[in-house]
Amino acid sequence: MLSPKDRADLEERISKIVVSKGFYFIDLEERMEKGAHIISVVVHGEPSVTIGDCEKLTRAILPLLESFPWYGDNDHLEVTSPGLDRVLKREWEYEIFKGRVIDISFDRDGKSQTIRAKLVGRENENVVIEYEGNYFRIPFDQVRKAKLVFDEGGKEHGKKQKRSHRKGT
C-alpha cells in the first residue's frame, strides 16, 4: 500500500491527467486482491463514463504509474466510473452529482433519519436537497452517509464501467 505522501502525490498527478482528458477525478482507492495491489482510479463524466473512456484513461495513466520505482508485477491499475451506489465521500462530490437521486442519512433533533431525495448541490457548509417538492439544507457535519441511487427513469449512471490493466499483460 502507498505511503500517505506517495498517495497524495499520485492523486495530484492522476487528477491532472483525468481532468486534461475532460473527466472529473473522484477518488483513488487501493486494495489487495489475491496477492495483487489494486490501484483503482474513480472518474466521472457527463453524461456517463464508457468502457472506451476507461480504456483511454488507462492508457494515459499507466505510463505515469510505470515511472514509479514501487510499481511492479503485482500492481494493477483499474479505471472505473463511480457506479450506481457510490457513497459520496467529499463535499465537492455533492456539486458534481447534483441532479441525481441520493439516499441521505443525517441527524435531526438527535435522531438519525434516512430519506431519498434529489441532490440540488452544496451551499457553504450544507448539502441542498429537494424532498417532496421542498428544498432543505442539511449541514455537512450532520450527514452520516449519502449515496447515489439508480433512478428508474434512467437519470442515474448506467452500469458501472471499468477497464483494468495488469503490468506485464
Swiss-Prot record:
InterPro entries reported in the protein's UniProt record: Ribosome_maturation_RimP, RimP_C, RimP_C_sf, RimP_N, RimP_N_sf
Domain of life where this protein originates: Bacteria
The keyword Secreted belongs to this UniProt entry's keyword annotation: no
Subcellular location: Cytoplasm
Keyword Cytoplasm part of the UniProt annotation: yes
GO aspect biological process, one term: ribosomal small subunit assembly
Any one Pfam family match given in the protein's UniProt record, by short name: RimP_N
UniProt KW keywords: Cytoplasm, Ribosome biogenesis
Family matches, as Gene3D superfamilies: RimP-like superfamily, N-terminal
GO CC, alphabetical: cytosol
PANTHER family with a match to the protein in the record: RIBOSOME MATURATION FACTOR RIMP (PTHR33867:SF1)
Family listed: Belongs to the RimP family.
Function: Required for maturation of 30S ribosomal subunits.
Name of the protein in its database record: Ribosome maturation factor RimP
Name of the gene encoding the protein in the UniProt record: rimP
